[in-house]
Amino acid sequence: MSISALGGRTKGKPLPPGEEERNNVLKQMKVRTTLKGDKSWITKQDESEGRTIELPSGRSRATSFSSAGEVPKPRPPSTRAPTGYIIRGVFTKPIDSSSQPQQQFPKANGTPKSAASLVRTANAGPPRPSSSGYKMTTEDYKKLAPYNIRRSSTSGDTEEEEEEEVVPFSSDEQKRRSEAASGVLRRTAPREHSYVLSAAKKSTGPTQETQAPFIAKRVEVVEEDGPSEKSQDPPALARSTPGSNSADGGRTKASRAIWIECLPSMPSPAGSQELSSRGEEIVRLQILTPRAGLRLVAPDVEGMRSSPGNKDKEAPCSRELQRDLAGEEAFRAPNTDAARSSAQLSDGNVGSGATGSRPEGLAAVDIGSERGSSSATSVSAVPADRKSNSTAAQEDAKADPKGALADYEGKDVATRVGEAWQERPGAPRGGQGDPAVPAQQPADPSTPERQSSPSGSEQLVRRESCGSSVLTDFEGKDVATKVGEAWQDRPGAPRGGQGDPAVPTQQPADPSTPEQQNSPSGSEQFVRRESCTSRVRSPSSCMVTVTVTATSEQPHIYIPAPASELDSSSTTKGILFVKEYVNASEVSSGKPVSARYSNVSSIEDSFAMEKKPPCGSTPYSERTTGGICTYCNREIRDCPKITLEHLGICCHEYCFKCGICSKPMGDLLDQIFIHRDTIHCGKCYEKLF
């Protein structure tokens, strides 16, 4: 039934209102869809009806206004696609509508553009590849869109439009854009440069100028807060090449390394290393892997150590290291341990299993001896917030009272260190004919060291201010330290004062734990941290889960003690919980394994060791036998012991309790709250608020 029939039939009879509306809607829809099969009526047009019928005439009408030169060009595309295009992401209306703006545009300019365009397009052929939308503003593009449709298949018209857009560029405009692009270049990564450059007009002059500064002859990775310290020696920076990395020839494996060297002379031969760099601290920050592990290689800590002036230099370096790695500036004091500075913070996989890549990161203060001993203990880790987890494989500095302390700093890294700690072959151990070594030992009084005496007697070496013992301090921040490190002495390295090349006692004994090996004579010693001498960096929220494993043949002392080393100069207090287990059977067998699990619930890392309670400085015999429990006043023998050093609490694990409700807290060290120097359990602490 046709609409007319429908309308005619219903004219005489009154229709219900709903039917009337329905008929109106049907009528409108039928008319529009019949006449406008392309559905272009959806876009608002003045001549909504009858347009399809008039399309040919409409086209001729449209073209009649435009110049003769333009007539042949629009026609072929328009006949093929009357419904519209999407060009460069902009939907363009059908030809009939686009012809209307086109009629006005040439007249708006006052002259038909086609004549000019024909002239221009003749010489516009070469620039055609550069016809890109970058040069147009949005408004200009909207004006051009209709013409782009019609000229899309023609060779010259797009260039014509491009040319018209390019012409307005004055030299000032070009200079302004080039400067803007070069400004962006300075701030963006190299991979983005090409894109940015394309934004400016590609004229060779300015572009080359802007690119020139980016050819980096040396990239110095320095935090803004501490550039001066790191750039102590610009020449050293220049020297920081892979060749210099391989001071021992073994470090050449560190590719992609950016070295930041603090001190001028870097000894290249291993043998001359100790003597030559004696007054000089070379602390190189090596960025070894994309994971941003920084490796502080202190090849000559001895040199650093030998002169007091160097110590001051070391401190800044170590501080910067900490700042760079942990983003913190905790280590301000010049007396920062060389342990810190020389701690080699290398990414976990840096030296893994490669003797050659043995990074020398003896973070030992008196590393000079070990340095001399050429034991490169590489400490690979990412430093926890300025808490240097000093995990040092304590190598037996047998007759050498000064040993090495390596700082192992792990920041949340579950440090899968995979490092092979190896001693350099043939390098005499400190104290064995290395003159630099003895001078260095006393240099840093505040570093703990552990000393193994060749006599085989278990002896406790306290961390005296002279620091003549090597302390292996392992602090991990949430590190459950999977330290896959094989500490090996390379064969033929005579032990300090021992001269026994066959004493490679540090074998990759336990890949998952830092080990301290005492001399084969089985002399075991315990290192005590003297209150006055040791600096504790209290690791902020440092939970160390250390697996303590001793290989049967060699005595190892694992003291992963999170008692972090801090500058004693700092004033703020840190809270250090030490839960210490001493296995009497192993002690008697010459293998004291003291794993100190510490959970530091205070984020303040400044903890002055002077506040250490007397129990901290009791001799080893007393510590193994005990100390006096703060709560029950009985001796602490072989039981687990809990020490809160700044509160003066030293007690049995089972005696440790909440100071308010007396709830046993020995197994709840992670739920301790200290308020006004009183231990609170979680519930009592909540009641305070």
From Swiss-Prot:
Chain ranges of the LIM zinc-binding domain: 627-689
Predominant cellular place of this UniProt entry's protein: cytoplasm
Tissue-specific expression: Expressed in placenta, pancreas and kidney. Also expressed in prostate, testis, ovary and blood.
Localization: Cytoplasm, Cytoskeleton; Cell junction, Focal adhesion
A GO CC term assigned to this protein in UniProt: cytoplasm
Region (Disordered), start-end ranges: 1-253, 298-534
UniProt biased composition (Acidic residues): 157-166
Composition bias type Basic and acidic residues, residue spans: 35-52, 217-232, 310-331
Keywords per UniProt: Cell junction, Cytoplasm, Cytoskeleton, LIM domain, Metal-binding, Phosphoprotein, Zinc
CDD domains given in the database record: LIM (cd08368)
Polar residues biased stretches: 95-114, 338-349, 448-458, 504-524
Residue positions, PTM Phosphoserine: 153, 453, 465
Coiled coil (UniProt feature): none
Modified sites of kind Phosphothreonine: 447
SMART domains noted in UniProt: LIM
Single GO term (MF): zinc ion binding
Stretches with biased composition (Low complexity): 373-382, 434-444
InterPro entries named among the record's database cross-references: Cell_Prolif/Cornif_Regul (IPR052621), Znf_LIM (IPR001781)
Biological role: May be involved in the regulation of cellular proliferation and/or differentiation.
Protein name (record): Zinc finger protein 185
Species assigned in the record: Homo sapiens
